Amino acid sequence: MRKNGSRCLKRSKKRCASKRKPAFSIRDTASFVCSAPNKEEKSDMSLKLHIVLFEPEIPQNTGNIARTCACIGATLHLVEPLGFRPSERNLKRAGLDYWDDVKIVHHASTKAFLDEHSADNLYFFTGQAERSYAEVDYAGEVFLVFGRESRGIDPEILERFAARCVRIPMKEGLRSLNLSNAAAIGAYEALRQNGFSGLV
């Protein structure tokens, strides 16, 4: 009788153990793989995204960025002087038929733009920054600022706004990513943090 009783006890313990929730499961890893916040978390600070190009030189890049802005609902800011005419064929071709769906704001100079906007809303993308673009908490009205393809953002501006500078990590020894790719990377990180609100 004792042997049978001990067997029953062991079986009941096994059943209980099988019903217990494991301390860690594969599902739990989801929070480590992608930590995008719930949409409700930033509902009081809905993202208003702007992409700013300081004196862009290559029309195809600007056209591609305009298309990205149209697809994500961002405003595109073009800061003069531009390295091309607004009627440039390559500019229109790169943006395809998305031009009617993007809001574009022109600024006479970098000074005019900087005088008009608070530094608290600006993030300057440069390879000289120490902080990664992914370490920033993007909320509210956000301006992602990019410099010229050939020289980037002027050193005096980077020095003035050193605390607002971020970089996109890349392999050591190489100069930079393509401008339109960099703009898309920065924009989609801001959108990811806000649960891609408004997108499908």
Predicted region positions:
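Acidic/His-rich, metal-assisted hydrolase cores and their charged scaffolds
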Residues: 22
